Amino acid sequence: MPRRYPEYTPERIKESKSYQVLLPKFNARRWAFGCSEWQDHGVDYSFEYVQDGFFHGFRLLGQVKGSSHLKFGNADSFSYALPVKTANYAVECSQPFVLFVVDLISATAYYLPLQDYFIANRDKYEKLKVNTSTISVRIPTRNTVSYADDDLVAVSYTHLTL
């Protein structure tokens, strides 16, 4: 019987392409990042904001998804089918958890801070209790990852409680 090995599936190729698009968009002088040791639990990357050359614990946990079929219903946002298990994990995290959705056609990376999203959309949060596989979230098209990253920096500060 021949040995079996993990397969490099089209889904894994899409995942690799999404990392290739997303990671160079971060300013490496302001963000340290690495593949997460929690990858099998929903976190693909951890990003830490570097302020004036020092680490202060301002972190983001990130789930990265790639798609060649994003549907922009209007110019302000688009809908994304988020796995409910990812949403539940995100809202329970003690650090800011960001969904990164990469448009593999335009090479644009969008982001959605999931805890903030479900706080602002309480009806969506309540739907997480229903036993479904996905929930539709709306991602603003203005939420793009780029060197002009002040909005993402602000998200990294949201865990502060002092």
Describe these PLM feature segments.
Residues 1-11:
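Interdomain/boundary linker segments immediately adjacent to catalytic/signaling cores
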Residues 15-76:
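Catalytic centers of nucleases
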